[in-house]
Amino acid sequence: MAAITEMATDSNDVINDGGTGDGIEKSTDSKPEIESDDLKPKSKPEYDQMKKLVAMFKKLNPEAKEFFPSYKRNTNQSDDFVIAIKPSGEDNKKVAINRRRRNNYNQGRRVRLPGRASKAQREDSIRRTVYVSDIDQSVTEEGLAGLFSSCGQVVDCRICGDPNSVLRFAFVEFSDDQGARSALSLGGTMIGYYPVRVLPSKTAILPVNPTFLPRSEDEREMCSRTIYCTNVDKNATEDDVNTFFQSACGEVTRLRLLGDQVHSTRIAFVEFAMAESAVAALNCSGIVLGSQPIRVSPSKTPVRSRITRSPSPN
């Protein structure tokens, strides 16, 4: 083949004569100086045909797509190792992959199930919760839960103070969404002096840390005399909050003001001597204390005394 290629040199090839240093074009039709009998073409047409074949082969690209076997994969493996996969095998592989996906098989990757699970639980809690507005201030959470218990099992009831109205609103959560749907029929029911409105809730009830809940009958009685106040001016002191509620509602027996450097406002727990004072304090929602309108709602937790640590012996 090398001999044939040498014979079929293109007519435009330049051959150096080695003497003058000038390039002299030499036609391929001229015969080489030394030519064996085996390389001599039998006829000129046969020679021309051979030359065309050699020229054609020289233009071919062995790596072209049409000359690359379909069963050979483009991998980092060496060229002498070829993996042959039948079309049916490829189809079976796709079926196996889909089956693993359906079975939540995710080798080498972390499946974030806890986040998805918590989102699903939150959405389920929203479906089981209704929003109740225009609640009279004389209505307690126990009384409201008793009213809605006719629709299904009530698992949580939270009354909150509305800063824009003397009336309050609440969230009632049921054990299933059927109870929440049934509760919608209670819209317009008179509770106290006002008919309440009942709508599907757009939020779930924020859970309370169980360690903060009342642990005894005495602490439950304390909760009935305690309010939870938010949006308190950051510059307000405990004396400011105490003076505000004592002059407007009644005697304050205990107060806890909490805040940090991150949030722009603070929160407060205020315990009164009488439960009636705590009910009256709910009317203070929307009143400006310092430079912020406060929001007041019944407290779910009592104000516990701070634990004082005795100095360690030397």
Curated annotation (Swiss-Prot):
Biased segments, Basic and acidic residues type: 23-47
Q: Which Gene3D superfamilies match?
A: 3.30.70.330
Q: In which tissues is it expressed?
A: Expressed in cauline leaves, stems, rosette leaves, immature siliques and primary inflorescences but at a low level.
* Motif (Bipartite nuclear localization signal) on chain: 99-112
Give the gene name.
Answer: CID8
Origin species: Arabidopsis thaliana
Q: Where is this region: Disordered?
A: 1-47
Lineage, top-rank taxon, reads Eukaryota
Protein's recorded name? Polyadenylate-binding protein-interacting protein 8
Q: Which SUPFAM superfamilies match?
A: RNA-binding domain, RBD
Q: List the molecular function annotations (GO) for this entry.
A: RNA binding
